[in-house]
Amino acid sequence: VNRRRGYALALAASVLIAGMGAARPTPAPTRTPSPSPTPTPSATQSDGTLQILTYRGYAEYGGTSPKVNWVGNFEKETGCRIAKLDTVQSAKEMEDLSAQRPYDVISAGPALAAKLIEDKQAQPIDPAKVSGYDDIDKRFRDMSTVSGKVYGVPYLWGYHEFIYDSTKVKGDLKQAFASDRVALRDSPLTIADAALADGSAKDPYELSQDELDRAVALLEQSKGRTYWRSPIDLVQGFATGSLDYAQATPYYRLLLQKAGKPVKALQTPETTGWVDSWMLGVNVPDTTCAYRWLNWVTAANAQRDAAAWVGLAPANAKACKGRAKAMCDLYGRGKKLDRVAFAVRPPGDCRADSGECTDYATWGKRWTALLAK
């Protein structure tokens, strides 16, 4: 048995790393392409260089595979030099780094994007300067538009599902939350998934105090569960037999199935998802290279490569060919996305100051308290 489990783990890990990369793939050192001067707190450099903050796998420079070097190609074709490329594994790491120093461009998720806009740390983008912007799905474009101003260029997106070992348990969503053998994403936004499972909330990101309490109560049922930050933990959990359920993406279900694990997805009427978008820093004195980067990452070819590499879907519909077709088919398109509640930073459009809804700070406190139990 141990030998079979070891083989399954090795196979899953090899597929994970070598097959298609990985969404927020295996940890790799932060890359500084060339020595960069110490940044000033007021502005980034304006000498034809770029300073980028993104997730691992979103802007490859050949460190994982010499055949995957988008940064090098960008530099050759545009004449702009990437002076600093900081990569992170989690949204929390990205928020922490973005608060420490300025960047020209950041690939932010919905919670951080809203914070950057609210704190005036991101500047509006002129979509007329971004070739291919209109090729991006309108629903994604609308998510990055605030008061008529565009603040982000949608890049990659995905959604969550609950997967389970079909030889051990049945597909029951509330049982998944109650189980000690379940792995949930380590994020306050997981409260939205609990709200969907509870079924009392109309919008999982606009929760009243009572709805928040009900969602957290559902999460508190199990004190022995795992909270993951790296998706590789999911692969290890199912490969070694220590997990019965997990919150994952369709991509990781596919990886486990290819590794011979009998995992299936729970069928739910609604689920949560997210869109990562490229944003422009507020203190960029010369945006020439920043806009060249935005044009580069909006193009179908760039999004096609990234989607196939990290196991997510491209925001540009024209990228759904060739290498990325499998990801587009896996996540779905068109009306299939109507069941996805795409994340916003709570309370979304609801007014927290009136007491109608709970804000993200409250979610964060409840999440921290949950992990401490």
Model-based region annotation:
Residues 18-46:
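C-terminal region of N-terminal signal peptides and the immediate post-cleavage residues
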Residues 39-115:
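Early extracytoplasmic/lumenal segment of secretory-pathway proteins
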Residues 342-373:
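Conserved C-terminal helix/tail region of periplasmic/extracytoplasmic solute-binding proteins
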